[in-house]
Amino acid sequence: MKKVKEAEKRNIKRKKRIRDRIGFGVADRPRVTVFKSNKYFYVQVIDDMAGHTLASVSTIEKDLKLNKNIDDVKKLGEVLAKRLKDKNISRLIFDRNGYKYHGLIASFATSLREAGIDV
């Protein structure tokens, strides 16, 4: 149990270090943050100054019917890019939320860039 608590503390410190480095999202450049569970992949676009979620997308949405794999996460990036373009948002700050930048995280960020969002 002690190892689990120590790992949790390390993860929290890593998240804080990353968040301090990237800064806060503002209205003209909000922060996009990702979360991976064992089954789903969640993404939120957050305006930290106002404390509002501007857009969100996840693999759990019924109309998308996606799984947590690289191809579906790329589709998720395209869907989020379309929603952001509808709201006239073209620049984001990418918050990987303590995860390594590879696999699902990297493919999601790449799909956002390919869709025309400046990350």
From Swiss-Prot:
<keyword id="KW-0699">rRNA-binding</keyword>
<dbReference type="GO" id="GO:0008097">
    <property type="term" value="F:5S rRNA binding"/>
</dbReference>
<keyword id="KW-0694">RNA-binding</keyword>
<dbReference type="InterPro" id="IPR005484">
    <property type="entry name" value="Ribosomal_uL18_bac/euk"/>
</dbReference>
<protein>
    <recommendedName>
        <fullName>Large ribosomal subunit protein uL18</fullName>
    </recommendedName>
</protein>
<comment type="similarity">
    <text>Belongs to the universal ribosomal protein uL18 family.</text>
</comment>
<keyword id="KW-0687">Ribonucleoprotein</keyword>
<comment type="function">
    <text>This is one of the proteins that bind and probably mediate the attachment of the 5S RNA into the large ribosomal subunit, where it forms part of the central protuberance.</text>
</comment>
<dbReference type="GO" id="GO:0022625">
    <property type="term" value="C:cytosolic large ribosomal subunit"/>
</dbReference>
<dbReference type="InterPro" id="IPR004389">
    <property type="entry name" value="Ribosomal_uL18_bac-type"/>
</dbReference>
<dbReference type="GO" id="GO:0003735">
    <property type="term" value="F:structural constituent of ribosome"/>
</dbReference>
<comment type="subunit">
    <text>Part of the 50S ribosomal subunit; part of the 5S rRNA/L5/L18/L25 subcomplex. Contacts the 5S and 23S rRNAs.</text>
</comment>
<dbReference type="GO" id="GO:0006412">
    <property type="term" value="P:translation"/>
</dbReference>
<dbReference type="Pfam" id="PF00861">
    <property type="entry name" value="Ribosomal_L18p"/>
</dbReference>
<keyword id="KW-0689">Ribosomal protein</keyword>
